[in-house]
A protein has these predicted regions:
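Small-residue-rich helix-loop
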Residues: 265-321
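Short, glycine/charged-rich beta-strand-loop motifs at protein surfaces that mediate ligand recognition
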Residues: 328-335
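Conserved catalytic or metal-liganding residues and their short signature motifs at active sites
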Residues: 1-283, 339-342, 346-354, 362-385
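Predominantly eukaryotic Lys/Arg-rich, low-complexity intrinsically disordered regions
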Residues: 311, 325-328, 344-345
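C-terminal catalytic domain of photolyase/cryptochrome flavoproteins
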Residues: 315-320, 336-339, 347-348
Length: 385
């Protein structure tokens, strides 16, 4: 064998050794890159490569619908079964990718049986981790300031995640429903209202975003909302009302009117001052929302209908006309809606004014024009150009 052949063999050996060394380095690197405890190294590499290829899908929601969907995981359900259920509800777009993700990150053994409430707007990664803790699953439930109890009932009927109806809820909060004695005493809720009817919990179902446990009953929802009222409307506020000669029932009743009138939050204390000034004089409140409450949904199917001046003194045949403060002196028999904390504080801490009248302003921004007794004629003549 000549010298050139020896040199060629040497070069080939070096190349082979280099390739083998490179393969070892690459293999070791892949092992380190994809290593996950409890996974076969080759399987880990395969899963990691697939996840890297679909990185965008992992962080992209399946859709834009914010509606919550109920997902049940039964004891013994595998990752594949769970993935199929998620795919069927359009919560993920790739069942296989979900299985690969939970296997690679060891979540497949942590997926917990239970009831979950998920959205299309969550990513696959977020859903995977959410399904490891059934105790954290809650039903979001929102009520707004200024709603009457029937509107809360309507929202219950629109929520497929709740297992009771709006009618069930009205039975535990409506007129004649049982009211916890301590709550009733604390807030000065009468046994019988001024119109001779039994009271309801109108006004005391605190408006907030609630996180409800799966399987909650109408009775339990009522208790959560009353507990929220007692949390935010403190004993100090009850005492403040008493110092002003008011029960919290009277404060909430007036605050419910202020809530419906005040579009701009900073005007709430001024509007409260108008009504308090009229009560002290005394003058009828002449509050439009009380007329709307009396009419209810009997006119156009909405709970707060448009009214005209003819409605101020023409509610013949309307069952709730005792709520109209154009027809009756003083406060209405009870609250007309759920006031927020701002409206309640406005009644407890009203602005100091000499206003007795107000009208909607002309800028369509929710603000009002206010008038004193001396400006009564100006108030009556006020019109927008």
């Amino acid at each position: 064998m000549n010298q050139s052949s020896h040199n060629l063999i040497g070069v080939l050996l070096v190349l082979i050794l280099g390739v083998l060394l490179l393969a070892c380095v690459v293999g070791a690197g892949l092992f380190v890159w994809a290593r996950q405890e409890g996974l076969n190294p080759l399987k880990a590499i395969q899963l990691r490569i697939n996840l890297e290829r679909h990185e965008d899908e992992l962080s992209r929601p399946a859709g834009s619908d914010p509606q919550y969907r109920k997902v049940e995981i039964l004891p013994g359900d595998t990752a594949s079964i769970i993935a199929s259920n998620l795919l069927a509800q359009n919560l993920i777009t790739d069942a296989g990718l979900f299985v690969d993700y939970v296997q690679y990150y060891g979540l497949d053994s942590q997926l917990e049986a239970g009831t979950y409430f998920l959205q299309q707007t969550q990513t696959l990664e977020e859903i995977a981790y959410a399904l490891t803790d059934a105790s954290a699953a809650t039903i979001p439930f929102l009520t707004l300031e200024g709603w009457r109890i029937e509107q809360i009932a309507d929202v219950i009927d629109q929520n497929p995640l709740l297992e009771f109806s709006g009618a069930d809820f009205l039975r535990v909060v409506g007129p004649g429903a049982s009211i916890p004695p301590d709550f009733k005493a604390r807030n000065g809720i009468p046994d019988v209202m001024s119109n001779g009817q039994p009271p309801s919990l109108e006004g005391f179902l605190f408006p907030a975003t609630y996180k409800l446990k799966p399987g909650i009953t109408a009775f339990e929802l009522r208790d959560e909302m009353l507990a929220a009222f007692e949390q935010y409307v403190t004993d100090a506020m009850v005492q403040q009302a008493a110092a002003q000669g008011l029960t919290m029932y009277e404060v909430v009743t007036l605050a419910s009117i202020v809530e419906r009138e005040a579009v701009v939050a900073e005007e709430a204390p001024i509007i409260a001052s108008v009504y308090l000034n009229r009560l002290r004089r005394p003058m009828r409140l002449d509050a439009d929302p009380t007329v709307q409450y009396a009419i209810g949904n009997t006119r156009d199917g909405t709970w707060w209908p448009q009214i005209t001046q003819a409605d101020y003194y023409g509610l013949s045949g309307v069952p709730n006309q005792s709520y109209s403060t154009y027809l009756n002196d003083g406060l209405p028999p009870g609250p007309i809606a759920s006031p927020g904390l701002g409206a309640i504080n406005a009644v407890l801490n009203p602005a100091v004014t000499e206003y007795f009248f107000f009208r909607a302003g002309c800028n369509n921004d929710g603000r009002h024009e206010f008038f004193t007794l001396e400006q009564q004629a100006e108030h009556a003549a006020f019109t927008c150009p």
